[in-house]
Amino acid sequence: RISTAEFHIPQSCLFTYDSTAKSKAEMGKNVYAGYLASAEVRSASEKKFERFCETCGAVDWVYKNGDKGAEYFSIVYIDSFGKQKSFFPDYIISVRGEIWIIETKGGFDRTGKSEDIDIFSPRKFEVLKNYLTKYGLRGGFVRWDDQSQELCICIEEYNENVKSEQWGLLRELVHKRGAEK
């Protein structure tokens, strides 16, 4: 049995920081005042996504979701054994007032080989896409592409191959959506 509950961004959140990181800049678009670029634990794709959001004029704000706990946003998916599991997308952002839900994954190396280690990515993509469609939201999976040195986004149909037409440049999609608003 799946239960649904209205989600609200928690009023406060505790973050740990890497005191040895060179960059300790405050990420001004994060919903939490004082959120630093050295927040831990985050993947390279998450750090690159946060930097993108921070410099993108179309992005209003960024919420870094937790990865477990009832206070965080999650969507249910079914694993290989038929068990219900909770999927916690990495980010909720606002692009010119429009809500997007984003999951970041391991990137692609220079040859286009996937560095995504999550075997449930295709299932998680489908439940995210269904959720976005049901609630009239935007979003998708975001991954770093070493060859183009760009963040890419997949929004329609999941494909492991970054060279496929399912992956587009995140900056182009965000700027296009921002210009339409």
Annotate each predicted stretch with a short phrase.
Residues 1-181:
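Electrostatic, structured charged patches in enzyme active sites and in nucleic-acid/phosphate-binding
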